[in-house]
Design a protein with these regions (language model features):
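Class I SAM-dependent transferase core
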Residues: 25-72, 80, 110
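Short glycine-dipeptide loop
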Residues: 67-68, 91-92, 163-169
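A short acidic, Gly/Pro-enriched loop at the edge of an enzyme's catalytic core
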Residues: 130-140
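Conserved class I S-adenosyl-L-methionine
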Residues: 168-191
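Core SAM-dependent methyltransferase catalytic element
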Residues: 189, 199-220
Length: 220
């Protein structure tokens, strides 16, 4: 009888521990709607005149990207920003072109070869982990991507670990409800700050490209 009671108690403890572990490993549901990550025609990112409308050189200046920098393009899509950043950081720098879409990663690989940009490193991430090397980045940018992230705390924790002290992290996006390919600026700022970042600048010159805000953060 005593042995049976001990076995039941042990079994109960195992069940409780397993349930607790499963809950800990299961991400909480999104606190707001998110947009489905884009998997369509990548050429839509290559609109003529976009470079000028978005003032991408100014964006890179404000992120303090220079020759020799290592920068992550998170949610790189067609590699539109990646190729421009690659030219900025030069042969001694690197651009980590991350995307969760295997077709996009393959597209960027081919594009980098075609444009002779050996400093672009395509990386296949997951929805919750961009697969970045800890303490490796001098800067990072999410261009029209944040509203697609279902679990920001997980992605931001991985990004935070990858950024060097003082490295700048930029988010360019438009105001929306999350499900309409945009997310309210105040929500983005709150989530990023809760993940251990501090906002250091805010700009709206990206409105010319249909994007409402450009936020810059550093990790605390």
């Amino acid at each position: 009888m005593i042995l049976r009671s001990k076995l039941l108690a042990t079994l109960f403890a195992v069940v409780v521990l397993s349930a607790s572990t499963l809950r800990a490993q299961t991400p909480a549901p999104p606190s707001h709607p998110t947009s489905t990550p884009y998997t369509g025609d990548l050429s839509i990112f290559e609109e003529p005149g976009r470079e000028k409308r978005l003032q991408i050189d100014r964006v890179m200046d404000l992120l303090q990207l220079k020759a020799g920098s290592t920068v992550a393009d998170i949610g790189a899509g067609s590699g539109w920003f990646s190729v421009r950043a690659a030219r900025r950081v030069g042969a001694n720098g690197r651009v980590i072109a991350e995307d969760i879409n295997a077709k996009a990663v393959a597209y960027i690989q081919q594009r980098a070869q075609r444009e002779h940009l050996a400093n672009i490193v395509p990386v296949l991430g997951t929805p919750d982990d961009p697969k970045l090397t800890p303490n490796s980045l001098d800067g990072a940018l999410m261009l029209k991507v944040y509203h697609e992230i279902a679990h920001p705390p997980l992605v931001l924790a991985n990004l935070r670990a990858a950024l060097k002290p003082g490295a700048r992290f930029g988010i360019i996006d438009r105001n929306g409800n999350g499900g309409d390919h945009g997310l309210k600026e105040s929500i983005v700022r709150e989530e990023v700050e809760q993940a251990g970042f501090r906002q250091v600048a805010r700009y709206d010159f990206t409105k010319a490209d249909g994007q409402d805000y450009f936020l810059i953060f550093v990790k605390q």
